Amino acid sequence: MFATEARQRYQQELTGIRDAGLFKEERYIHSPQGADIEVEFPAGDPARRVINLCANNYLGLSSHPEVVAAARAGLDSRGYGMSSVRFICGTQDIHRELERRLTSFLGTEDTLLFPSCMDANGGVFEAILTDQDVMIADRLVHASIVDGMRLAKAQQDTFKHSDLAHLEEKLQEHQDKRQRLVITDGVFSMDGDLAKLDEIVALAEKYAGPPRARPPPRSRSRRTR
């Protein structure tokens, strides 16, 4: 009985989504990812060649012959996947070697690999922040950053998109926090505009340092007749 009622309820919801034009149909790709691909859409129609403007394959590396050959060599030598997270069974030595090479190339203290940028954004804030800290993010940051912020215990706040005056107000407002972490995209994925990184860094450095007592609100004087 319950299963029947649940199925009917879900079917009604799906019907409403379709009627509103919001139901997403999958596209079946019959070719490697690239600037143009062979796509079957709608499902059941003959596949046709189309220009692909929506993939994250910006440099075309997913089907580059050298990348494909390296992936094939990795499968032959190490098999498919880790079969666990790295701290259970261990991590592959070739992963650690890649981290070392990236560290040398970037000139950083160390490097940590994640399976995707989504996973990296989901893991970084929780690891470095506590409930004594605050995250101050541009309101148009990527959804993966928003998800990562939700996992952290730190307080969340935002500033208007690329509005440095508003960011400074937020930094002043949160001077009582142990750490004030400013979060922004480098290139904003929806609009394509660039973050004002030099100015953001300058503001972050201006308000860096130990926590300070929050200044009292300004009192408003009243005029008397």
Language-model regions, residue ranges each:
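Conserved N-terminal alpha-helix of the aminotransferase class I/II PLP-enzyme fold
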Residues: 68-116
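Short, structured coil segments at secondary-structure junctions
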Residues: 131, 151-153, 207
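Short, small-residue-enriched loops and turns at beta-alpha junctions
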Residues: 61, 88-92, 143, 164-165, ...
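Active-site-proximal loop->helix
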Residues: 127, 145-152
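N-terminal "arm"/small-domain region of PLP-dependent enzymes with the aminotransferase-like
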Residues: 2, 6, 10-78, 209
